[in-house]
């Protein structure tokens, strides 16, 4: 069981992310900060992203890059390029 020694320093961050398939891997992309990861399954991609985010937020100044997102939608469009 994980215990927090100093609960006053614990901050919860709500994280929004998307997962998409690229080749044989699933890519997990965080929308709040520029962090991504991947895995061979959706669950693995999500778990790997969570681990990467925990490492990222260990930096005392990483919270400055955090963008709070209350709602996220996925859209699709077509572009005609020359």
Feature map (PLM): residue ranges:
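A short, exposed loop/beta-hairpin motif centered on an aromatic-Gly-Thr core
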Residues: 33-42
């Amino acid at each position: 069981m994980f215990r927090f020694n100093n609960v006053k320093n614990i901050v919860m961050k709500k994280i929004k992310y998307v997962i998409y398939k690229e080749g044989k891997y699933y890519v997990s992309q965080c929308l709040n900060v520029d962090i991504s990861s991947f895995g061979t399954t959706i669950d693995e991609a999500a778990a790997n992203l969570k681990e990467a985010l925990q490492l990222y937020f260990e930096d005392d100044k990483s919270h400055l890059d955090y963008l709070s997102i209350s709602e996220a939608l996925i859209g699709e469009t077509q572009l005609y390029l020359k």
